[in-house]
Amino acid sequence: MISTAWLNAPIHQVDVWTQHLGPAILAGRLNYERSSGVAYFEWSDEARSQHLDLSPLRVPLEMGVWASNRERELPEDYRGLPGFLNDALPDGWGLYLMDNALARAGIPPEQITPATRLAFLGDRAWGSLSFQPVMEQGTSELMSLDVLGREMEASIEGHLEAVSDELLQAGSSPQGARPKVMVDCDEGFRHAKVTRGLPDEGFRSWIIKFAGRDEPEDAPLLELAYMTTARNAGLHVMDSKVLTIQGKHAFATKRFDRSPSGRVFTHTLGGLMHFSHRRIGLDYGTVAQVMDALQVPETAYQEAYARAAFNAAMSVRDDHSKNFAFIKGQDNRWDISPAYDLTYMTGPGGYHTMTFADGDTQDPTQQDLLNLAPLYHLSEAQARPIIQTMADAAMQVVPMAREMGVSNATLKPIASRLGVINASIDRRIGGGRGRQVHPQDRKGDSD
């Protein structure tokens, strides 16, 4: 049960902690001035002494006090927060459930500040951040996946009065429009509970997605086919599977922000740049420029380029700035995160959200992809086999999806669209069939 002790105490200040692969460290403090709607953030002395530069492009350690009213173009959907804190908040489905959870607690909408939302998340946020004070929400109770499935179905149908507090908490943390929960599951997927901090022994942290009301029931199967194809093509993705819950399919993927070593700090491309994921027009070249600024390992460029080629060949057009992320390693260096949210999308108006080198966002050509290569520190000779590998992958995904049980009704327009796309890319790169090239030789996911 969510405590009602906050009814007459709007939250205007939260301490921000990070538990990045080790003990918790006070990163800084957020103050929200309700009268003006201005948010202020300042890094802690501990963050500065440990060179914990968590958002170096827009909120560097040496900045002093960051204030939202000094940002000329801070996106409206950031609610006055700096990007790395906005990354912790849900949008779409998760925000819908969070608003309902706060309403259930009796908190008037006019008392909900950005600090309130962070306090509601507490230690359930994506990545390594936690927030104090924490809005008291009780302990995490075990639930069977069948119960989880029934409650998700009720929430999708809009019957939130039939949904438990646990489901509202599990579903109010993740980002994205599709119905999903972040839960810790036992090895046999018999039981789940709300993710808080690190999972208990015998549990792993997963994101479980369900088909939305406007999606075919086999959407989870299609996403698994895409993720499997991505792995086969050499992209770094997390372990994924499809679960059958209450007779319906759900897509489950292991979380990369939780590891045996601890929580992993994660920052989206949009959050780093203070760029709204709702804006269209960011360029794939910008991804490479941000990688340069973060000084990621050289191996990351080939992986990131391969993802651009994969998105082009496979019609992954929901390629907005929240679907690219960076993580901090144990050595405090930046790297790109594993790829995620890879599935077929027609895109806004039939276009990619992100543009390619020559501004083409509908059906990028082979030359568009080759023009990107120098930005990713690749020669044309290195880029061509990568493009070939991803074009080959596009020819494999439909048969694989059919074997997994995706219906012909779902697959027919996808097969047709992928054929058009890859005619544009031209499968026979350089007049011959390229050999299979893995973007980088990465080890599998940590256990």
Q: Which residues are covered by each model-predicted region?
A:
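Phosphate/dinucleotide-binding and metal-coordinating scaffold of catalytic cores
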Residues: 1-321, 325-447
